[in-house]
Design a protein with these regions (language model features):
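Core nucleotide-handling region used for phosphoryl-transfer chemistry
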Residues: 6-220
Length: 220
């Protein structure tokens, strides 16, 4: 079931692109230049504690509650979700019981659950699991992103997985962590990387959400 997002309230928005913290070398290597930050706000906050969660290698997926009905979409309005994933999403979020949970939890508020569709046949997801599923990493109600505790409460209500917190720490600590090429916390997969957010929700002077990622492949 796919929602036509044209004309729908802008909080049905796509998840923002998450940038790496550092600039890339422009002299041919294309490698990240550690310490040369792309965003002044991230540079300012680099020694603060950030919450780092595991970045899952899958397909970005939105579960959308418009106040009355649930629907599913990919990262962009045109993105096509695999049929196996749509079937799993219907299992996790479809039907009368889940509709009652949406109504009880959110009423007529506009809600987007952001997650990753992952598993066999999606990217290199077969090492995570042999089937496909959805793992929650963020949620937005009426244009406001929710706290980690709220996200965990939603995951509990629907009996779905949520991306694990790997640690709280600085940007440099996250970089050193991925340099060690750690194992994923799921299945036998190698970890793709980490996504970091300040312990409190922040935006920069342009109103852009402060969030970043460090990927293993960028530090090999």
């Amino acid at each position: 079931k796919r929602l036509n997002l044209k004309g729908v309230m802008n909080n049905m928005r796509e998840y923002e692109k998450i940038e790496t913290p550092f600039k890339r070398d422009m002299n041919g290597t294309k490698k990240l230049i550690e310490g040369d930050f792309r965003n002044d706000s991230i540079a300012f906050l680099k020694n603060n504690e950030w919450m780092w969660t595991e970045k899952i290698d899958g397909t970005n997926t939105r579960v959308i509650w418009d106040g009355h009905n649930v629907s599913f979409a990919g990262h962009t309005d045109r993105a096509q979700l695999p049929n196996t994933l749509i079937a799993k999403l219907n299992e996790l979020f479809g039907g009368n019981t889940n509709e009652e949970i949406f109504e009880q939890e959110f009423g007529e508020k506009q809600v987007i659950l952001y997650g990753e569709g992952y598993g066999a046949g999606i990217q290199n997801g077969g090492t995570y699991r042999k089937d496909v599923s959805f793992i929650l990493f963020d949620a937005n109600i009426d244009g406001t992103y929710l706290s980690r505790q709220n996200i965990e409460d939603i995951a509990k209500a629907f009996n779905i997985d949520v991306v694990p917190i790997i640690f709280n720490g600085t940007v440099d600590e996250a970089v050193e962590y991925v340099k060690a090429k750690p194992q994923s916390t799921i299945g036998t997969a190698k970890m793709e990387g980490l996504v970091g957010k300040p312990l409190v929700e922040l935006t920069d002077r342009r109103g852009k959400r402060i969030i970043t990622k460090v990927k293993v492949c960028d530090f090999e």
